[in-house]
UniProtKB/Swiss-Prot annotation:
GO terms for cellular component: plasma membrane. The chain crosses the membrane at residues 34-54, 80-100, 125-145, 181-201, 205-225, 253-273, 274-294, 311-331. This is Polyprenyl transferase dpasC. Its EC number is 2.5.1.-. GO terms for molecular function: transferase activity, transferring alkyl or aryl (other than methyl) groups. Pathway: Secondary metabolite biosynthesis; terpenoid biosynthesis. It comes from Apiospora sacchari (Arthrinium sacchari). It is a multi-pass membrane protein. Polyprenyl transferase; part of the gene cluster that mediates the biosynthesis of the diterpenoid pyrones subglutinols A and B. The first step of the pathway is the synthesis of the alpha-pyrone moiety by the polyketide synthase dpasA via condensation of one acetyl-CoA starter unit with 3 malonyl-CoA units and 2 methylations. The alpha-pyrone is then combined with geranylgeranyl pyrophosphate (GGPP) formed by the GGPP synthase dpasD through the action of the prenyltransferase dpasC to yield a linear alpha-pyrone diterpenoid.
């Protein structure tokens, strides 16, 4: 029996290694996919985690309480379905991005050890894993929305995720088109299914999109801000290889660019929160975001590209806190 176990151990080890590499490929070993669920379960998309969470929880807060038939259990169930769908789709998008970028990643110090760039995962394995995650995401959305308008919610992010890695190519810079545009859209979009998860029987798809516009715009510019700061870590290698990125717009004036990106965020947050008439949200969301983003912009040092990495962590914590704030708002509305 011992000899049989020994004979099987290399294959078992190889299988475990592949499973781990697939999880790494989808960034499931990191917090990155959680950005996609912030806006929607407020559906992201999170950038994404916060986007989804923000949209779904606050939509639910407008319906609970005052004798309403809408229960906390149902709102939390819809939010969980939204978050799971976003998380799974984000993982699929990461696989596609790394497959397209595998040759570029192999020549960048920070990314050369990624599963596809290093050859630990084959193209066939990666594509099967990607399709599986997309199928799971579609099924979860179908279940959450009772089969209504599922393709309307999926198609925009499918197209965006497909185009995103191509936006990094040098030819796109000639048209002033940068991958951060697509990333911002795909992370912001989950706000729509997040709201629809709650209102799908009460408003049309177009009405849900319109209601989410302030949140969509806020998350769009917030995502470009945090991704520009984070990607700036690779500025030296990216410029050597001619990688197209948003921080090349103003060259050495990246700090000014980041400040400008926060202007629409500062405008859209009040526009979105105004509909809820909640002092708690003004303090816990608008107030905390103002202090955090001001702190981030003062800490960023364009002469030290590594400083962008810490901003990524700060924004994840900011999104996570806002999910907590939205949950508290929901509970206060329900028990008031």
């Amino acid at each position: 029996m011992a000899s049989v176990a020994k004979a099987r151990s290399p294959k078992s080890t190889q299988s475990n290694s592949l499973v781990y590499d697939l999880l790494v490929l989808s960034r499931f070993t990191k917090y990155n996919p959680l950005f996609t669920i912030f806006a929607g379960g407020m559906f992201l998309f999170v950038a994404s985690f916060p986007t989804t969470a923000f949209s779904c929880l606050l939509a639910g807060s407008t319906l609970v309480g005052n004798g309403s038939d809408v229960t906390l259990t149902w709102v939390f169930r819809q939010t969980a379905l939204c978050l799971s769908a976003c998380y799974s789709f984000c993982g699929a998008g990461m696989v596609w991005n790394d497959w397209i970028d595998r040759d570029i990643d192999a020549n960048v110090a920070r990314t050369k050890d990624r599963p596809l760039a290093s050859g630990r995962v084959t193209t066939t394995q990666a594509m099967l894993w990607m399709v599986f995650q997309m199928a799971v995401s579609w099924w979860l959305l179908h279940f959450m929305l009772d089969g209504k308008d599922v393709n309307n919610h999926m198609l925009p992010v499918v197209i965006g995720s497909f185009l995103y890695p191509f936006g990094k190519r040098p030819i796109c810079s000639k048209f002033y088109f940068y991958p951060q545009y697509i990333l911002g859209f795909t992370i912001a979009w989950p706000a729509v299914p997040g709201r629809t998860a709650i209102f799908h029987g009460q408003e049309t798809f177009a009405e849900s999109v319109q209601a989410c516009m302030p949140l969509l715009n806020m998350v769009f510019f917030w995502t470009i801000f945090l991704n520009t700061a984070y990607s700036y870590q690779d500025v030296v290698d990216d410029r050597k290889m001619g990688v197209n990125s948003f921080y090349n717009v103003l060259g050495k004036h990246v700090h000014l660019l980041l400040c400008l990106l926060l202007v629409p965020v500062a405008v859209c947050v009040p526009m979105y929160l105004n509909q809820f008439h909640s002092t708690w949200l003004w303090v816990s969301w608008a107030g905390v975001w103002a202090l955090s983003l001001l702190r981030q912009i003062t800490r960023f040092d364009e002469k030290n590209p590594a400083s962008g990495g810490s901003l990524h962590v700060d924004n994840f914590l900011l999104g996570a806190w806002t999910v907590v704030a939205c949950t508290i708002e929901l509970l206060m509305r329900y028990y008031s």
